[in-house]
């Protein structure tokens, strides 16, 4: 009798587990089918983070509007802020680490999962170009530090000093107090849309340009580049060059990028999470919001004083964004809109601009 009861319990348990597994598999197939059946976007579009994304988008649009590849468009586009001497969170004018060294991070990815990245790269103005070459000319995904510099020089890039007089002055001002605290939405000061707080760059600077594009053939691509946190510890690397954190692209679904305090994005594999949420049927906006809320749920106290924002675009060309703090914005460029800057929704409404 007891053995019969045990057998029945095992049978019922196995049946329930089997039913649950079948239901989960069915839900997964349904979500995948919804993604596969969604119509592709007819046209080209490029989106990017922050105010400086407007100029970057225009450069990318010159590629897209002439029938170019989305991958070439994003590489071209983000080179604009990399060369912009007003921009202290990306490229050659970026603020240095606490030892006075300017180090740059970047990543690039296409719809087929091909990707390349560099981190802690010094003396090269355009890290995004080196990331592209890592993708195209090596079997690797990520090169860092001295090895990344050696590779860049071997590819014909010229070594140059990236510490500008303005950045050097700001660094020496910081050394007087040597206190590091990231400031939310720090890039806004450099582009005249917010009030200056303290010295140039404030107490810290941690913002990034992330760019996503879809071309006329429906191909998706993304790029992300930054000089990272101002006054960071030497060797610190944030989310921007980490595939799945600062950037992720899947041609079956869409693409996502992030900005803000990279450590929080890395802890949650943020951009990968956004793309997977879109795969499950969420809109870009909904996916970005859920990724932000997940960061907040894990670290509720810390996130009240820092910024993280996500920007996403699915393969239908639909765009969405969400941030922890008020002040994050993104730029959109397509055949109808050439220089549109859109404020993102946020969890908290306190303005840090």
Predicted regions located by residue number:
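N-terminal secretory signal peptides and thylakoid transit peptides that target proteins
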Residues: 2-19
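Well-ordered, non-transmembrane segments within structured domains
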Residues: 7-12, 32, 221-228
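Hydrophobic h-region of N-terminal signal peptides that target proteins for export
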Residues: 21-27
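Extracellular/periplasmic ligand-sensing ectodomains of membrane signal-transduction proteins
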Residues: 334-336
